[in-house]
Amino acid sequence: MTIELEDLGLTPELADVMQRLARVGGQIARLISRNGLETDLAAGVGTNAGGDGQKALDVIADNAFRAALAGSAVAHYASEEQDEVVTLGEGALALAIDPLDGSSNIDVNVSIGTIFSIFPAAESPEASFLRLGTEQIAAGYIIYGPQCALVCSFGRGVHHWVLDLDAGIFRRMADIRPLPAETSEFAINASNYRHWPKPVRAFIDDLMAGADGPRGKNFNMRWIASLVAETHRILMRGGVFLYPGDDRKGYERGRLRHVYECAPIAFLITQAGGGASDGCDPILTALPDRLHARTPFVFGCAGKVACVAAYHDLPGQETSALFGTRGLFRS
């Protein structure tokens, strides 16, 4: 598997890393297409560093990416599936990766993916990743869906490739267009409504009010439970995604990892003209304090992300900006 990288102005080292990522991505796509025929990729095999259950494909993907990057310019490899940073060599780059995002969807044939982030290597392994998201030199994902696609930014817009399985090449497509200013879709797990903080409930209440509410139009809700799939949809047609912190034990800071998931997605979305925050402040200017730190996450069309932040500025007794106290499923 190879990827078309002509005219992107990449250094030889970065281009080589992208070729290695694409090669493994293509291999994983083929493996997923045969799930259940030879191996149950959704079989539980343990628990990762963050306390989440691991599927067989989580471990397979992590091992494959780590092995492929050995001997490359990647000195430090940080994986959501590993407790600590793995040192691969003495190169000039550091790569953070969620090898298999959305693994709970493997056995139901829903799109899953790989998320990656590339930094210049720092003096120590952890320092290479505990830094501002604005310091990323590349970030992207591979989505394993009806098509296998790779989306990446090198800080100059967002590029898009689709895997030509017959030729074994990720073909470059038209670049991702800027996100629209307006949107009529939002993504959130509404079953957790009772646990959300008031500002999030207020924002969703006003969207649910539709044409009769302060937004003056109807909205559709989406929820795939696969961050890569949610991101791809938003990049293709707009929208806003919310995974807030809530009052459940272990969910106070949400469930998504800053280093492995939120920072790279925030980099992509920002390069597409959108916004990304923890509900109040930009993700890209937040400093994670540990490798597996979690953060609330809101991203998508810039206006909607800013609107969520504005709801957090309302007086504490307010639960809706214009319509007073109202529940999600009440008029």
From Swiss-Prot:
Pathway: Carbohydrate biosynthesis; Calvin cycle. GO terms for cellular component: cytosol. It is found in: Cytoplasm. Its cofactor is Mg(2+). InterPro entries: FBPase_C_dom (IPR044015), FBPase_class-1 (IPR000146), FBPase_N (IPR033391), FBPtase (IPR028343), Fructose_bisphosphatase_AS (IPR020548). GO terms for molecular function: fructose 1,6-bisphosphate 1-phosphatase activity; magnesium ion binding. Mg(2+) 1 binds at E80, D98, L100. Its main location: cytoplasm. This is Fructose-1,6-bisphosphatase class 1 2. The gene is fbp2.
